[in-house]
């Protein structure tokens, strides 16, 4: 009975299946955690969604910004970009079933026994766990309702970038989705910076990676996240696990077995890209 955490799959179905075979994943006894961005850029987004959905209770995932963008395309709000390679998914006979399943997935996973939290981009240091859980529920409730297109239409934007319990309506939901799915850097007070994407050693002062600013959640829990492929899984404090290692850019798909903290990797089938590129809706 093992727990396997895998970084952003981005439609890299063959690599996902190879990595799961490498660790001898058994869905009848093991649990798979996925950091989000299941889709886009790789050639197998349709196959990834079908497979992950088939795992049922054996998988715990969170939504990423590419997953949200796919839902916006599905709802007719955003256009499908050829580089995302989503055409076969959007035209599949089971697209409605898959995407209505996807929009009912969470933004946050918490395991109190393991003292483990997972979100696609991380947890803003401005939140304690109770606030993070409530904020996740706020967006999840809208996404799973019939009014989800109204949120998806309003989610694109960088403001507000500072948390307050006084935030309400679509502005509140936009901050929450940005914090869970797009965040990289923060100012020392925890305010989000939505523009900088360079490596931490090149980031302009006073910006810091969100995980370099102590917060109530990181002080009490381990945090697993994806989203930030250019970190290449390095440079995080103890207890913070960066799992996106850029498989869709020619890097690797990374798996962490939680029980013994052993890492496994599967090389990408694609040529290494020098440009990580810009994530859609980021």
Curated annotation (Swiss-Prot):
Keywords, comma-separated and alphabetical: Hydrolase
Pfam name, any one: Metallophos
Enzyme nomenclature, EC number: 3.6.1.41
Domain of life: Bacteria
Signal peptide: none
Any GO molecular function: bis(5'-nucleosyl)-tetraphosphatase (symmetrical) activity
UniProt keyword annotation of Hydrolase present: yes
Reactions it catalyzes: P(1),P(4)-bis(5'-adenosyl) tetraphosphate + H2O = 2 ADP + 2 H(+)
Function: Hydrolyzes diadenosine 5',5'''-P1,P4-tetraphosphate to yield ADP.
Protein name per Swiss-Prot or TrEMBL: Bis(5'-nucleosyl)-tetraphosphatase, symmetrical
